[in-house]
Amino acid sequence: VEFLDVVRRRKTTNGPFRPDPVSPEHQRLLMEVAGRAPSQLNSQPWRFVLVDDRSMIERIATISGESMTEAMSNGTFFERYKPYFRFSAAEMQESRSGMLFDKLPAALRPFTKQVFTRRGQKLMNSFRVPQTLGEENRKLVAGSPLLIGVMLDRSEYRPGELSSFYSVFSMGAAMENIWLTTVEIGMGIQFVSFPMEVPGRWAEIESLLGVPDDLELMAVYRLGYLPADQQRPAIDWSSHERKLPSQYVFRNTCATPETEWDDR
């Protein structure tokens, strides 16, 4: 696959993976490309823990599913991220950013405009939407053959200092290398983020992974091979839209948007 095709095809996998274990060769490759990422002064602050033990994956999946249910039930998730929710193609076309919820059960579609109100939250809770989403999330994580915990060396990652920015920037480059490589080898990847949304749950995952005091757990991802027929969850979204170059590129100064590329 040509490199630019890989970049353009990169995406998050919301659906299930095949149950096949990720081969040792591919695990090794993913770690190699991560280690090839740039870092300030070649500090290489990243550390990774590969999780393929079924019982541990199941336990992390339970934490993730419960976290999603709680964050959805109490409204904190919708309140925190409502600027990024879209419920029509027109909304998505106008903003060219965020997530378009284009797959919803028929019973919920009439209530999308109320999702950010108290009444909307009560309706979702009465339809047990948080429980449905939480269980879907649990099953997705539990069905993943591989999880990757991404950590930073605390001697490099020092919040409030410039070194912290360098470390996070380097970690992002390492993860992008992994992400692009999954496209090349027929795999998918998704951020397991909900345990970070609920106080105390992230610490449970740190404990499960045995993260030592000199490392900071920054993220967990689920990975696996993509099935030929990719099934979408009962409630799903897409995020293919991208801003026009003139919305994020400037020429010489930030007062002059680059307008020549929008029609390409």
Segments predicted by a language model, with ranges:
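Acidic, surface-exposed loops and disordered segments
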Residues: 1-264
